[in-house]
Each structure stands twice: as structure tokens, then as C-alpha cells.
Amino acid sequence: MFTGIVSGTAPIVKIEEKDFIRTFTVDLDKYDDNLEIGASVALDGVCMTVVSIENNLVKFDAIEETLSRTTLGKLSVDSSVNIERSLKMGDELGGHIISGHVLMSAKIIQIKDLSLIHI
């Protein structure tokens, strides 16, 4: 589970294409404390599972369904992704409890600038 509060951004340093899977290698230098294989990390709001860790480089696999329903399918090397680690017992719930399981993507058709806020 996630709060929806983004911790920061991290760069994609490598993308590998395999049979039916795209593997993203992300430099999680600032966000890899106690990270383990099998852990959940939200990349641009999408719940992803850690499949490999080498120093600060963390790999995530995405299947075609994930790539077609999210913005992950449009990412390239050097793209930055929003990062959020999953909740742990005792963590502050500063946002909203969300699962990170994406149903679809939507296109923003208008942004209204209301001085200090954007809608």
C-alpha cells in the first residue's frame, strides 16, 4: 500500500527488452535503504516489484499490459520517474491509502492557473 505522496524522482539508467517483458533499471540511490528483492515500489504511481538490486541500481519488470495501461510504456533511458516506497507498519499516513494498481491512463486536456494553485 502507498500514501500517494511522492518521495522524489529517480532516473531510468537502462531498459532491456525480453520476451513479453521490459526491464527498467532505476538508480534509487536516495531511496534504497533496506530495500529487498520482492519489495513494492511505486514508479510514477504504478506498483512495481523489485526483481534485482546491485548497489543502488534496482530492476523492475513490466509486462505488456502494464506498459499499455500506464505511462511506463512511454519512458526511455534518462527519463525520471516519481518514486514512492510502500508503507510499513508505523509509517505516517500523510496522504491517502492507495494500492498503485493502475486501471488506465488519462490525457490532461486543460490546466487552469489560479494564481497559487493549478487545477
Predicted regions and their residues:
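Conserved loop->alpha-helix
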Residues: 1-117
